[in-house]
């Protein structure tokens, strides 16, 4: 159950971001009497989704044939990539959430005013916008699946994606009003704790791969207080990568990541032209 929730939340959030992008594009095309271009939008969405799925399956199937130490190394690398992507996702959304709509509409206008290849330009714009959300999800899910071999994580991911699509459709048709600013703020805070757990897990994987053997003394042992076999321990392990007897290096990495991330997260956001440039680059690279 607990191993299901984190993949569910990540896929729901990422899927909702992608759904909102498609919804904004569809609404703008409809509002500007250019609904005939919706076919190009769906081509971009489908191609991006298929590519992300293929990349995820390929990486997951390929690594299963690695020797044990190479698998641990790859698991650590994937965890590091997932931490970087999740962190970028949190702070990018915090920085440009208020200006995405304006720059997305500008990117659509640029694509459709690009001459004879305007249809392909729109396909490319949608493809890159959706593919980036998809690749963020792929690397996080690879890290999650490697930490939990059960069926809970895939089920959570699928349910999260389905819910995101349904909510995105409801928002587009006007049936649901979601306070997106609060939603992304609190899910972002949760994701930072998840990323800290992944960072600690990466160090553990690198140790098992034989690459990191420093500070391997047990920092503390809570086996008798909060075992991972207890209900709360299982919850914390599934959510945040909790370990009942972590090493000094795991605890250090956890807080070295989490403390600066939380400080930056709670600092007042700066409203600058840089935010607009960042948004434009993400939507229309």
UniProtKB/Swiss-Prot annotation:
The chain crosses the membrane at residues 5-25, 39-59, 73-93, 122-142, 151-171, 183-203, 248-268. Residues 26-38, 94-121, 172-182, 269-285 are cytoplasmic. It holds the Pfam family FTR1. Its main location: membrane. It is found in: Cell inner membrane. It comes from the Bacteria. One of its GO terms (cellular component) is high-affinity iron permease complex. Keywords: Cell inner membrane, Cell membrane, Ion transport, Iron, Iron transport, Membrane, Transmembrane, Transmembrane helix, Transport. GO terms for molecular function: ferrous iron transmembrane transporter activity. Residues 1-4, 60-72, 143-150, 204-247 are periplasmic. It is a multi-pass membrane protein. Part of a ferrous iron transporter composed of EfeU, EfeO and EfeB. Uptake of Fe(2+) ions across the membrane. NCBIfam families: EfeU, EfeU/Ftr1 family ferrous iron transporter subunit. Belongs to the oxidase-dependent Fe transporter (OFeT) (TC 9.A.10.1) family. This is Ferrous iron permease EfeU. It comes from Yersinia pseudotuberculosis serotype I (strain IP32953). The gene is efeU.
């Amino acid at each position: 159950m607990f191993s299901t929730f984190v993949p569910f939340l990540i896929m729901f959030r990422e899927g909702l971001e992608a759904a909102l992008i498609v919804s904004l594009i569809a609404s703008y095309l409809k509002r500007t009497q250019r609904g005939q271009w919706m076919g190009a939008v769906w081509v971009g969405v489908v191609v991006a989704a298929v590519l992300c799925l293929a990349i995820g399956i390929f990486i997951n199937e390929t690594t299963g044939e690695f020797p044990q130490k190479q698998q641990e190394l790859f698991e650590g690398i994937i965890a590091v990539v997932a931490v970087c992507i999740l962190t970028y996702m949190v702070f990018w959304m915090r920085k440009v959430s208020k200006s995405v709509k304006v720059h997305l509409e500008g990117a659509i206008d640029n694509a459709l005013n690009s001459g004879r290849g305007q249809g392909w330009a729109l396909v490319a714009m949608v493809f890159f916008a959706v593919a980036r959300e998809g690749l963020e999800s792929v690397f996080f899910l690879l890290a999650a699946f490697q930490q939990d071999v059960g069926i809970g994580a895939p089920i959570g991911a699928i349910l999260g994606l389905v819910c995101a699509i349904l909510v995105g459709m409801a928002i587009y048709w006007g049936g649901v009003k979601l306070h997106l600013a609060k939603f992304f703020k609190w899910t972002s805070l949760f994701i930072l704790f998840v990323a800290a757990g992944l960072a600690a897990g990466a160090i553990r994987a690198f140790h098992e791969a034989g690459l990191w053997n420093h500070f391997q003394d047990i920092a503390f042992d809570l086996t008798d207080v909060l075992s991972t076999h207890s209900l709360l321990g299982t919850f914390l392990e599934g959510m945040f990568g909790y370990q009942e007897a972590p090493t000094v290096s795991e605890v250090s990495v956890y807080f070295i990541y989490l403390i600066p991330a939380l400080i930056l997260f709670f600092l007042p956001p700066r409203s600058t032209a840089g935010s607009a440039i960042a948004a434009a680059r993400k939507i229309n690279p």
